[in-house]
């Protein structure tokens, strides 16, 4: 049975912009994730698996943190997941960029202002835009997958298991956590 696994990265703040979409103000936070053949949290994500599934991130939610119920991760699309983490943000314009995946977090400003977490995100983005010394914003992909046994070559990369992705659930925004993949690996906002 596939399990949900969360893969975390850092946000690159250089290209934050504002757009009006559907008559509403949005922050657009460019982000990169899932570099090919990366090992994160002990799992190897092969280029073949990423290439086969990354487009599934288009239109997914971008919750604040990975939603949980009683300490267990749940889909961001479940009622509990929506109630726990939705701040008016979702993922758009997903595409392959070199050996990694580019996507944008579109944050509906009015919706984000309705929750403490959404307001905290807006404040953090404003601080980053001002050049204040604040913690970076990280992101984290959640995928439903099976953990397969690695072969000898895959184990040599540091992998304890190999991801067989079934589907992508979401790409979360993290304000108080560090990503599993780093900017040095080409990941983040």
Model-derived segments and their meaning:
Residues 1-189:
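Signature of dsDNA virion morphogenesis modules
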């Amino acid at each position: 049975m596939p399990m949900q696994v969360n893969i975390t990265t850092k946000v690159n703040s250089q290209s934050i912009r504002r757009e009006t979409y559907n008559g509403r103000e949005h922050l657009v936070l460019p982000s990169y994730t899932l570099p090919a053949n990366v090992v994160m949290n002990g799992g190897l994500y092969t280029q073949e698996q990423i290439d086969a599934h990354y487009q599934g991130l288009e239109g997914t939610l971008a919750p604040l943190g990975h939603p949980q119920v009683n300490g267990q991760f749940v889909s961001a699309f479940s009622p509990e997941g929506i109630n726990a983490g939705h701040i008016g943000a979702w993922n758009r314009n997903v595409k392959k960029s070199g050996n990694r995946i580019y996507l944008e977090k579109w944050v509906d400003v009015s919706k984000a202002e309705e929750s403490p977490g959404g307001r905290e995100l807006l404040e953090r983005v404003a601080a980053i835009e001002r050049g204040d010394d604040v913690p970076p914003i990280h992101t984290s992909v959640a995928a439903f997958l099976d953990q397969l046994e690695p072969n000898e070559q895959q184990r040599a990369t540091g992998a304890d298991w190999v991801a067989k992705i079934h589907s992508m659930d979401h790409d979360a925004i993290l304000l108080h956590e560090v990503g599993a993949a780093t900017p040095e690996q080409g990941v983040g906002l």
